[in-house]
Curated annotation (Swiss-Prot):
Subcellular location: Cell inner membrane
Residues covered by the 4Fe-4S ferredoxin-type domain: 368-398, 408-437
The protein's name in its UniProt record: Ion-translocating oxidoreductase complex subunit C
Top-level EC class as recorded in UniProt: translocase
Function, as annotated: Part of a membrane-bound complex that couples electron transfer with translocation of ions across the membrane.
Cofactors: [4Fe-4S] cluster
Biased composition (Polar residues): 645-658, 686-698, 725-738, 762-774
Region feature (Disordered): 459-496, 533-774
Cross-referenced Gene3D superfamilies: 2.40.50.100, 3.30.70.20, NADH-ubiquinone oxidoreductase 51kDa subunit
Chief location of this protein within or outside the cell: membrane
PROSITE patterns named among the record's database cross-references: 4FE4S_FER_1 (PS00198), 4FE4S_FER_2 (PS51379)
Length: 774
């Protein structure tokens, strides 16, 4: 059985599934040789013209640069530098619209040419056989070369992935896209440089076989390559014209019958594929030292007066090429397509710049390429599935992409779609399937990047949390170790812990204060007991307001004790902090303490000896105020006695309806009333005698105020006596309000009157105190 390499050398070819045969229309632009386009007035250079990351800027606005001078630098293998296509001045660094299906804007360097074409210093390496593969890869990377067939993957990175494992090197010269002839004309005119580029790549990868795959619709290019590759160990294989045979996986299938595994790359199966445009750029970079600053662009379509291929400087606005090469827009449907009719996209405007992956500008008329705006519903014919070269299910992919069910799209291997457009070409409903796939891929890519960013943020947070916990544990261990070391050191020195010593000192000071606190507790308890007794007595006697005199005394006692404790604490603190105080200060402090103790003992004795019948404001009362209060109380007692006498005299005048009244009950009630009156008079006499024993609480009371208060009290007493006399004269004229009056009711009324008299006396006393305070 022949090996794979032997089968390839024998001329055997295979085929891939699906595929179509669209109208090629390549003859418009391949009959003219390549010419140089003029230098435009402005060059717009996007920082990112490849798959990967943009390089770091090396220039600023206002700098003058030379032709071939690096404008950015790379710091990773997925970065590529860009170079100045001509000499001039950097006029701006700003976002501009770039070649993208969505018309996105990216950061660009705007260069104003000076038309001098002054070159930067070049470093050619014509004897590349003496250089190592690593050195050659570095030179290729420095030249900024990427895949020029349309993908734009960094060439050096791709070659690096195939080091030491590439068995077959495949040169992609198929150029299957209709209208595009850039590679065809390049092979005709620069076949020698293409072969040089192949030899450089062979020196890097050292493959067992190199095979060039080219479609049979390029006979002139085949002849040029055969002539340039004479006596070279290369196989030039002409393959049938079929779209998309120029796809990497499809060309591998045709030439080797091998399939790239899902999610893998050709290097995984020992293969490496390179485009002829990339190889020509490699030869210029190594042999001549020129970086990638220009490329071949096909200008085709019926809107061009003379379609052809041109060398266009990178960054040249499309409008400059249109103006130079006779473009005349269609009046009803002006369109500019970057790329071919199958895989290209419509430009938003003509100021988009030429980049490393821009191989064609197609300007068709409305009759040449019809618009695809007439989308209709899918009729489920299945032609898209038959035409798919990757054996996908375009119909179901479109359904899920339209419904934004991107997880289903991934399950159906949407990422394997090469966006060749074969499905859309055969669709009778004119559904733009590729547009749905591109949008779905972009959304999936965006979500994937967001998920990766979230995972990175989560990992950073967890690492930070673990680090903080670790630092906290280390700090605690350090503190514990330091405390342990201190403790051991003090034990070794025969001392004790300073903190423990401080605690002991505080406890000792507290113990010194406790006896004083305990000595005053009995006095407080006695005062509380007296206050509770007076409250109980007031409740039994029916008083409406409780006697709070004892509580006032208790509050004063607590304040005094707090002041004494504060003074004692200050004395103890001063004694502990100033050990060198003299004997005089100590004697003075002791005398003050003894005086305060005697004063407290005297106050406790006085509060204990004070009678329980004292009025609520007896501690603060003035002797004159007490006399006034006694006079008021006597007047009210006389008034109450008169009312009782009237109430006992009324039963005799009652109507005949009270025949059941008992004379004995009336006599008993009268006796009770007289006894209560005598008791009230006795209490008044005692209260008048008490002022001499009361301790005045205010030494600054004004005698004039007391005299005024006494006069007011006498006036009120006279008014009360007059009212009593008038009320005593009216009973004979009064009409009894109740025919069933009972002597018991009269007694109850007398008791109520006495209670009201006592309440009025208390209120008048409190009012006098309030006026005195004011």
């Amino acid at each position: 059985m022949l090996s794979l390499i032997e089968q390839i050398k024998s001329g055997k070819l295979w085929d891939f599934p699906g595929g179509i045969h669209p109208f090629e229309n390549k003859h418009q632009s391949n009959r003219q040789p390549i010419i140089n386009a003029s230098i435009p007035n402005e060059l717009v250079l996007p920082l990112k013209q490849h798959i990967g990351k943009a390089g770091d800027l090396l220039v600023k606005v206002g700098d003058r640069v030379l032709k071939g001078q690096p404008l950015t630098q790379y710091t990773s293998t997925f970065m590529l530098p860009i170079h100045a296509p001509t000499s001039g001045v950097i006029s701006a660094i700003e976002p501009r619209t770039v070649a993208h299906p969505s018309g996105l804007s990216e950061l660009c360097i705007v260069l104003t040419p000076d038309q001098q074409e002054e070159w930067f210093e070049l470093q050619p390496q014509p004897d590349f056989q003496q250089l190592t593969p690593e050195t050659l890869l570095e030179l290729i990377r420095q030249a900024g070369i990427s895949g020029m067939g349309g993908a734009g993957f960094p060439t050096a990175k791709k070659l690096q992935s195939g080091l030491s494992r590439t068995e077959i090197l495949i040169i992609n010269a198929a150029e299957c896209e209709p209208y595009i002839t850039a590679d065809d004309v390049l092979m005709r005119q620069y076949a020698h440089e293409i072969i040089q580029g192949i030899e450089i790549v062979e020196h890097i990868l050292k493959p067992k076989l190199t095979i060039i795959g080219i479609e049979d619709n390029k006979p002139e290019a085949v002849a040029a390559l055969q002539q340039a590759a004479q006596d070279k160990p290369m196989v030039i294989r002409v393959i049938p014209t079929k779209y998309p045979s120029g796809g990497e996986k499809q060309l591998i299938k045709i030439l080797t019958n091998l399939e790239v595994p899902k999610g893998g790359i050709p290097a995984d199966i020992g293969l490496m594929v390179q485009n002829v445009g990339s190889l020509q750029a490699i030869a210029r970079a190594i042999v001549h030292g020129e970086p990638l600053i220009r490329r071949v662009v096909t200008l085709t379509g019926d809107c061009f007066r003379k379609p052809r291929n041109v060398w266009a400087l990178l960054g040249t606005p499309v409008q400059a090429l249109l103006n130079e090469f006779g473009y005349k827009a269609d009046k009803k449907l002006p369109r500019l397509i970057m790329g071919g009719p199958m895989m290209g996209f419509t430009l938003p405007h003509a100021q988009v710049p030429i980049t490393k992956t821009a191989n064609c500008i197609l300007a068709p008329t409305r009759n040449e390429l019809t618009s695809s705006d007439n989308e209709m519903a899918c009729i489920r014919c299945g032609q898209c599935a038959e035409a798919c070269p990757v054996s996908l299910l375009p119909q179901q992919l479109q359904w899920h992409a339209k419904a934004e069910e991107f997880d289903k799209c991934e399950e159906l291997d949407l990422k394997d779609c090469i966006e060749c457009g074969a499905c859309a070409y055969v669709c009778p409903s004119e559904i733009p399937l590729v547009q749905y796939y591109r949008q779905a891929k972009a959304e999936i890519r965006t979500r994937s990047l967001e998920a990766e960013a979230a995972e990175r943020a989560k990992a950073r947070f967890e690492e930070k949390k673990a680090r903080m916990e670790r630092d906290k544990a280390e700090r605690e261990n350090r503190f514990k170790q330091a405390a342990e070391d201190r403790r051991k050191e003090m034990q070794q020195q025969g001392g004790s812990d300073a903190i423990a010593a401080a605690i002991e000192r505080v406890k000792a000071q507290k113990a010194q204060l406790e006896p004083t606190d305990n000595s005053v507790k009995p006095a407080i308890a006695a005062a509380i007991a007296r206050a509770k007794a007076k409250q109980a007595e007031a409740a039994q006697s029916g008083a409406s307001e409780p006697d709070n005199s004892e509580m006032a005394k208790l509050r004063e006692e607590r304040k005094r004790q707090a002041r004494e404790r504060k003074a004692q604490k200050g004395e103890v603190t001063e004694a502990s902090t100033s050990d060198g105080a003299d004997d005089k200060k100590s004697a003075v402090a002791a005398a003050i303490a003894r005086a305060k103790a005697r004063k407290a003992e005297q106050q406790e004795t006085e509060s204990a000896a004070q009678p329980a019948q004292a009025t609520p404001s007896s501690d603060d009362a003035d002797p004159k105020k007490a006399a006034v209060a006694a006079a008021i109380a006597r007047a009210k007692a006389r008034k109450a006695e008169q009312q009782e006498t009237e109430s006992t005299a009324q039963p005799a005048q009652a109507t005949p309806s009270s025949d059941d009244a008992d004379p004995k009950k009336a006599a008993v009630a009268a006796a009770i009333a007289r006894a209560k009156a005598r008791k009230a008079e006795k209490q008044e006499t005692e209260s008048a005698a008490q002022p001499t024993q009361a301790t005045p609480s205010s030494d600054d009371a004004d005698p004039k105020k007391a005299a005024v208060a006494a006069a007011i009290a006498r006036a009120k007493a006279r008014k009360a006596e007059q009212q009593e006399t008038e009320s005593a004269a009216q009973p004979t004229q009064a009409t009894p309000s109740s025919d069933d009056a009972d002597p018991k009711k009269a007694a109850v009324a007398a008791a109520i009157a006495r209670a009201k008299a006592r309440k009025a006396a208390q209120q008048s006393s409190s009012n006098l105190n309030a006026e005195e305070k004011d």
